[in-house]
């Protein structure tokens, strides 16, 4: 601490705290003349206006952000364009661009001063930490060090206003300490390619619970929308005869009408929040434990280790909520006879406990866990390959936008699910049967009595779920993030 304070006193250029902030204060902090600033802004405009047309459109801004290697350029381009285009004529001329630069630099200087409470003309790690804590953001020492290191371009341990400005100049949102931290978190921590198993970026933020709310609502919406396909898939998986989709649909309708297609969906929704929470926290614990064992920071562990940590976290989450999954399957596969109503959840759960014992709630758990690592590995490898192909052949080396990433994730997820689908069929059959059976026994009996094709019963409705589920989850999640002010 003392070393940092000494460094701060030696390296910072003290600046008196002014009253109302003006461009003159910005020039003083940057040690820049008006002419030099004009030239700098004009040069930046020309950089974006690479075709010398005299104005900027959204495509030019997006191209410029990609050239500057700014992550999320596809998204910020639209938002930056909207903020700059003051007269809403669909183009940004130099005067509009200049007005944005003036407003943004003044805004950044104000918050720079708010963090620099000692008015030394620089931000120290301690000052930044104090501001984050006051904003309700928990941050570990190593995260703070990475934050400072990312912004501190000359590596002197402190952040000058020029470095602060460069980091945030093209950030189109209001520069509050919460937004700035969230921006850094996304820029530096989120890597969709390496997070195919569990996405990161929720670290120790004050609004962490809101991410779970957004994810929970998105998951509930997508599961409800695809519930009929899920019920159809489960019924086809347990069929001993040739599984025909039309007959299965008729059976569902006969037994429950429209509501029959949504049987078990309530439990499916209930699983979302605890499964996501357990998976996230287990992932963080496994990353920390593996990083400590390898003598590395958890942020520096490689893709393979992340894949393993994600798989282990998925296994823990799956095992924790597995009884709910088994009861859901029993509800979905229950056949009403002679007008007998489907039993209530409590009655069905009690019946399983009394007649089959507590172990029955974990029937099929082993094949379920067995498929996690292969699925994650195939999903990750396919995702990375598809993203690279899209970058090379479709986007001309630009970074994939959210829709391209969604498409890559959808295809890779479908491929991974198909490869481990036989394990899913075996799991469902073990869950649905009252008799105690082993995984190998179900495999052998299925193949000998029905052939290898039986291991893929219900695959079509399972694949048909993928696109709408991914699309609905993405759209609802993005909408919820805006509603909860997470963006």
Curated annotation (Swiss-Prot):
Residues binding Ca(2+) 2: 152, 154, 156, 163
Membrane side Mitochondrial matrix: residue ranges: 230-263, 325-363, 424-457
What does the activity regulation annotation say?
Answer: Counter-exchange transport activity is saturable and inhibited by pyridoxal-5'-phosphate, EDTA and EGTA. Activated by calcium Ca(2+) and manganese Mn(2+) ions, and slightly by iron Fe(2+) and zinc Zn(2+) ions. Repressed by copper ions Cu(2+) and slightly by magnesium Mg(2+) ions. Magnesium Mg(2+) ions promotes slightly ATP uptake, ATP-Mg(2+) being exchanged with ATP(4-).
GO molecular function annotations of the record:
ADP transmembrane transporter activity; AMP transmembrane transporter activity; ATP transmembrane transporter activity; calcium ion binding; calcium ion transmembrane transporter activity; phosphate transmembrane transporter activity
> GO biological process: what's one of them?
phosphate ion transmembrane transport
Q: Which InterPro entries match?
A: EF-hand-dom_pair, EF_Hand_1_Ca_BS, EF_hand_dom, Mit_carrier, Mitochondrial_sb/sol_carrier, Mt_carrier_dom_sf
Residues covered by the EF-hand domain: 36-71, 72-107, 108-138, 139-174
Q: Where are the Solcar repeats?
A: 206-289, 301-389, 400-483
Q: Which residues bind Ca(2+) 1?
A: 85, 87, 89, 91, 96
Record keywords: Metal-binding included? yes
The UniProt keywords, alphabetically, are: Calcium, Membrane, Metal-binding, Mitochondrion, Mitochondrion inner membrane, Repeat, Transmembrane, Transmembrane helix, Transport
Q: Chief location of this protein?
A: mitochondrion
Q: How does it sit in the membrane?
A: Multi-pass membrane protein
Task: Tell me which GO cellular component terms the UniProt record holds.
Answer: mitochondrial inner membrane; mitochondrion
Stretches assigned to the Mitochondrial intermembrane side: 1-211, 284-310, 384-405, 478-487
* Membrane-spanning intervals of the chain: 212-229, 264-283, 311-324, 364-383, 406-423, 458-477
Q: In which tissues is it expressed?
A: Expressed in flowers, leaves, stems, roots and seedlings, mostly in aerial parts.
Q: Where in the cell is it found?
A: Mitochondrion inner membrane
> Which family does the UniProt entry place this protein in?
Belongs to the mitochondrial carrier (TC 2.A.29) family.
Q: What job does the chain carry out?
A: Calcium-dependent mitochondrial carrier protein that catalyzes the import of ATP co-transported with metal divalent cations across the mitochondrial inner membrane in exchange for phosphate (Pi). Can transport phosphate, AMP, ADP, ATP, adenosine 5'-phosphosulfate, sulfate and thiosulfate, and, to a lesser extent, other nucleotides. Binds calcium ions Ca(2+). Also mediates calcium uptake.
Domain writeup:
The N-terminal domain can bind calcium.
Descriptive protein name: Calcium-dependent mitochondrial ATP-magnesium/phosphate carrier protein 2
This chain's source organism reads Arabidopsis thaliana (Mouse-ear cress)
- Gene name for this UniProt entry: APC2
């Amino acid at each position: 601490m003392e070393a940092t304070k000494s460094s701060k006193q030696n390296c910072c250029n003290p600046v008196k705290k002014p009253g109302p902030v003006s461009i003159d204060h910005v020039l003083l902090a940057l040690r820049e003349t008006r002419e030099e600033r004009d030239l700098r802004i004009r040069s930046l405009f020309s950089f974006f206006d690479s075709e010398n047309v005299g104005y900027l459109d959204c495509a030019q801004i997006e191209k410029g952000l990609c050239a500057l290697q700014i992550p999320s350029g596809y998204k910020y381009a639209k938002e930056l364009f909207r903020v700059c285009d003051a007269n809403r004529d669909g183009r940004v001329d130099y005067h509009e661009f200049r007005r944005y630069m003036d407003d943004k630099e003044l805004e950044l200087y104000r918050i720079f001063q708010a963090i620099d409470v000692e008015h030394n003309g620089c931000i120290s790690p301690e000052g930044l930490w104090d501001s984050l804590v006051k904003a309700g953001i928990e941050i570990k020492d190593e995260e703070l060090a990475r934050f400072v290191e990312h912004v501190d371009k000359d590596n002197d341990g402190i952040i000058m206003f020029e470095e602060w400005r460069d980091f945030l100049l093209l950030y189109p949102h209001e520069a509050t300490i919460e937004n700035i931290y969230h921006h850094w978190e996304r820029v530096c921590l989120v890597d969709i390619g390496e997070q195919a198993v569990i996405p990161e970026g929720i670290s120790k933020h004050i609004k962490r619970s809101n991410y779970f709310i957004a994810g929970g609502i998105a998951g509930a919406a997508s599961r409800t929308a695809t519930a009929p396909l899920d019920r159809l898939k489960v019924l086809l998986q347990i069929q001993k005869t040739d599984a025909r989709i039309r007959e299965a649909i008729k059976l569902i309708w006969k037994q429950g009408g429209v509501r029959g297609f949504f049987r078990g969906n309530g439990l499916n929704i209930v699983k979302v929040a605890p499964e996501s929470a357990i998976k996230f926290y287990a992932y963080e614990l496994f990353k920390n434990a593996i990083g400590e064992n390898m003598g590395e920071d958890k942020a520096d562990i490689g893709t393979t280790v992340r894949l393993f940590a994600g798989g282990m976290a998925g296994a823990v989450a799956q095992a924790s909520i597995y009884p709910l999954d088994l009861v859901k399957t029993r509800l979905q596969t229950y056949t009403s006879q002679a007008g007998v109503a489907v039993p209530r959840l409590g009655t069905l759960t009690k019946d399983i406990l009394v007649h089959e014992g507590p172990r029955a709630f974990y029937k099929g758990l082993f094949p379920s866990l067995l498929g996690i690592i292969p699925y994650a590995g195939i999903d990750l490898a396919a995702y990375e390959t598809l993203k690279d192909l899209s970058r090379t052949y479709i986007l001309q080396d630009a970074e994939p936008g959210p829709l391209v990433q969604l498409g890559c994730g959808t295809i890779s997820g479908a491929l991974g699910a198909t490869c481990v689908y036989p394990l899913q069929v075996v799991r469902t059959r073990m869950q649905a049967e009252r008799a105690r059976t082993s995984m190998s026994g179900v495999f052998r009996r299925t193949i000998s009595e029905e052939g290898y094709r039986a291991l893929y019963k219900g695959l079509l409705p399972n694949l048909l779920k993928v696109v709408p589920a991914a699309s609905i989850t993405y759209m609802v999640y993005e909408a919820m993030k805006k509603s909860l002010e997470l963006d």
